[in-house]
């Protein structure tokens, strides 16, 4: 990455993260002025994001859709573009930026990690057991995520209602 692209990219990430934070605070405390500031952070972040993609396009000579970083950054850019158009035309959807900005920060963070360029598998990994292992490991992570989500929901309801009802009888 060129210096201009790097500065623009990380400025966008920081602004999206600030936007996400303001969205969360605005939604939690039901303050539309805070949510409006979040939209401003998101819009400025979008300008920096556009600059980063433009510099990348100029530097490489092709649209930023080929490498992993480029394709994820472009997908995030389109997501923010869609959100900005939506919240401009339908202000009632302004708070949906909490999901957009949060996801975009995660995607851009993921895209900026070391190379995900695919290569040939080594002979020791060319086995049906790799597929079986990856399937079960991924399924286990999914189960842990579901369990964590149910646990958070259970704790939230228990602490705020003091009655769980029949649907939350959890075996322990």
What are these regions (language model features)?
Residues 1-172:
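Polytopic transmembrane helical bundles with strong interfacial aromatic enrichment
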């Amino acid at each position: 990455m060129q210096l201009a692209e790097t500065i623009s990219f990380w400025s966008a990430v920081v602004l999206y993260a600030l936007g996400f934070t303001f969205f969360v605070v605005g939604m939690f405390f039901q303050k539309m002025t805070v949510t409006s500031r979040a939209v401003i952070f998101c819009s400025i972040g979008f300008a920096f994001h556009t600059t980063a993609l433009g510099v990348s396009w100029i530097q490489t000579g092709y649209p930023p859709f080929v490498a992993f970083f480029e394709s994820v950054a472009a997908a995030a850019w389109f997501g923010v573009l869609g959100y900005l158009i939506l919240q401009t035309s339908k202000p009632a959807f302004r708070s949906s930026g909490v999901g957009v900005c949060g996801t975009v920060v995660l995607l851009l963070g993921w895209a900026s990690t070391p190379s995900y360029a695919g290569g040939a598998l080594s002979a020791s990994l060319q086995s049906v057991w790799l597929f079986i292992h990856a399937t079960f490991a991924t399924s286990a992570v999914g189960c842990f995520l579901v369990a964590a989500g149910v646990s958070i929901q259970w704790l939230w309801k228990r602490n705020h209602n003091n009655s769980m009802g029949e649907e939350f009888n959890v075996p322990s």
